[in-house]
């Protein structure tokens, strides 16, 4: 939902199978470790990622093809994951020699040292007799001639990309000292059709933009999705039956239920970090306020009661505070309050308007849309200081954080055409890229790491 749509609406109303871990087990801690504090510290770290080996090249029921082709595809996904996060510049798998199956755990370090590789990622893929796939992943320090990490997973053929994401997560966590984020999913709104008759469907995809799946038919407009903390459901706004209300979509059962019966239109839903509460805004008698209701059902509690429009809400990671937007001062601005609705405090005093705030999983920053002519993605501390812009386009809005709080996804609307697409940017603001989607896309919502 665009900012204009959200506030206009309020004014008018006054809106999977798990991967099983298998051998090899992770190695003991040792070798390279550290914490990324500066982008340049790791930017030139040479990570070689050749195609994964296989014990036998046999057909698989995957989109990649045989186990040999799948080994190439696994390395490509891992390399792309690490390249696109802004910390590393991996090389391969193209132009690199593929190791033999027997070399995966006994690399020729001299070969890789001659290629100026500092780190080496090798692995294998094996087709099992039960139809499953086993993927092994190994991280080596070339100079030390030492294995740093190893892990393996047994996955269904349809989930082969999850094994690649998990391998990238293992590498990222070891080399950066930070929590990983690749093995996660994004809920978003898939858009199609002309501007005056736009179809908006609830959809999900992998964090890198692969494996798209539509969840709703598009007969009713869907907006502002949010994954539950346990990944079992998605909270979203729908115009099902012609009235804007909040629903929970059950991903296993492919069913949806109404969150609560209310006298006025409801919109801008959000989960609490523990999944026990749902925040929402409701417009009644010319006023819009924020409420919370037990996720299991029950009576709603009103959290704001001021003249004007109070919209949205994002919990701090510990669930003790809520950041939200309000026009009580005359324009959209960002406020923070306690989770019980007490102690409201404005934190945006930097000119223009501020909207769609989202608390970082780390708790140290709040991402939001800053509106001064154009719409830009920015971050600020919970106290309102340290303002930084991450994008500089015509209309960027609705930021959502990666599980580790290092990457932000948002959607960008093209001037003139009105076409929307999902983009991501790291906290330096220098590593920006568009995610590929089958059609137009908006309202991204990044979920936590998959279990």
From Swiss-Prot:
A GO biological-process term: protein import
Record key words, sorted: Cell cycle, Cell division, Periplasm, Signal
Gene Ontology CC: one annotated term: periplasmic space
Superkingdom field: Bacteria
Signal peptide: 1-19
Cysteines engaged in disulfide bonds, as pairs: none
Main location: periplasm
Subcellular location: Periplasm
Residue segments, region Disordered: 18-37, 431-451
Compositionally biased tracts (Low complexity): 18-29
Subunit structure: The Tol-Pal system is composed of five core proteins: the inner membrane proteins TolA, TolQ and TolR, the periplasmic protein TolB and the outer membrane protein Pal. They form a network linking the inner and outer membranes and the peptidoglycan layer.
UniProt family annotation: Belongs to the TolB family.
Protein name from the UniProt record: Tol-Pal system protein TolB 1
Gene: tolB1
């Amino acid at each position: 939902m665009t900012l204009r749509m959200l506030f206009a609406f309020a004014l008018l109303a006054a809106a999977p199978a798990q991967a099983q871990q298998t051998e090899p087990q992770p190695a003991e801690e040792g070798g390279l470790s550290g914490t990324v504090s500066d982008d340049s510290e790791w930017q030139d770290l040479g990570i070689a990622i050749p195609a994964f080996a296989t014990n036998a090249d046999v057909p698989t029921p995957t989109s990649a093809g045989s186990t040999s082709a799948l080994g190439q595809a696994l390395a490509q996904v891992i390399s792309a994951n690490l390249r696109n996060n802004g910390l590393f510049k991996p090389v391969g798998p193209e132009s690199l020699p593929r190791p033999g199956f027997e070399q995966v755990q006994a690399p020729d370090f001299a070969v890789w040292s001659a290629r100026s590789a500092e780190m080496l990622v090798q692995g294998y893929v094996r087709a099992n007799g039960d139809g499953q796939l086993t993927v092994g992943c190994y991280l080596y320090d070339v100079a030390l001639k030492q294995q740093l990490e190893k892990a393996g997973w047994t996955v269904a053929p349809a989930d082969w990309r999850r094994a690649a994401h998990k391998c990238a997560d293992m590498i990222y966590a070891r080399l950066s000292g930070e929590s990983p984020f690749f093995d996660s999913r994004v809920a978003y709104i898939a858009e199609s059709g002309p501007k005056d008759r736009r179809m908006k469907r609830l959809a999900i995809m992998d964090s890198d933009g692969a494996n798209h799946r539509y969840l709703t038919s598009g007969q009713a407009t869907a907006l502002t999705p949010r994954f539950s903390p346990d990944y079992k459901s998605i909270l979203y706004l729908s115009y099902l039956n012609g009235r804007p209300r909040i629903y929970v979509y059950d991903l296993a059962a492919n069913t949806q239920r109404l969150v609560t019966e209310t006298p006025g239109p409801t919109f801008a839903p959000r989960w609490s970090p523990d999944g026990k509460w749902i925040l929402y805004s409701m417009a009644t008698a010319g006023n819009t306020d924020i409420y919370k209701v037990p996720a299991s059902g029950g009576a709603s509690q009103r959290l704001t009661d001021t003249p004007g429009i109070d919209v949205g809400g994002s919990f701090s990671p510990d669930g003790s505070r809520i950041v939200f937007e309000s026009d009580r001062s005359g324009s959209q601005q960002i406020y923070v309050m306690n989770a019980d609705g007490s102690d409201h405090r404005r934190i945006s005093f930097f000119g223009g308007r501020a909207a769609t705030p989202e608390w970082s999983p780390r708790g140290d920053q709040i991402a939001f849309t800053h509106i001064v002519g154009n719409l830009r993605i920015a971050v600020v501390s919970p106290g309102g200081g340290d303002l930084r812009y991450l994008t500089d386009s015509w209309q960027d809005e609705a930021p959502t954080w990666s599980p580790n709080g290092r990457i932000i996804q948002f959607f960008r609307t093209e001037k003139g055409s009105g076409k929307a697409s999902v983009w991501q940017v790291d906290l330096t603001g220098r590593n920006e890229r568009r995610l590929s989607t089958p059609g137009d896309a908006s309202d991204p919502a990044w979920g936590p790491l998959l279990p």
